[in-house]
């Protein structure tokens, strides 16, 4: 994922910072506890396409 693009993107739910998980190809919003998929290099920033993160995934 392009780092400049990542700097511009925010979580559509919280408007907060996103982290890119290279292994799972997901953008992580810790504040919303959601992981948005990146398909073919394109972030899918739809809440209904995101999966909920577990406490373990968040390191809690």
UniProtKB/Swiss-Prot annotation:
SUPFAM superfamilies, per database record: Trm112p-like
Family matches, as InterPro entries: Trm112-like
Give the domain of life. Bacteria
What's an example GO cellular component term for this entry?
cytosol
By sequence similarity, the record places it as follows:
Belongs to the UPF0434 family.
Q: Which PANTHER family match?
A: PROTEIN PREY, MITOCHONDRIAL, ZGC:162634
Q: What is this protein called?
A: UPF0434 protein Pnap_1922
The organism's taxonomic lineage, starting at the top: Bacteria, Pseudomonadati, Pseudomonadota, Betaproteobacteria, Burkholderiales
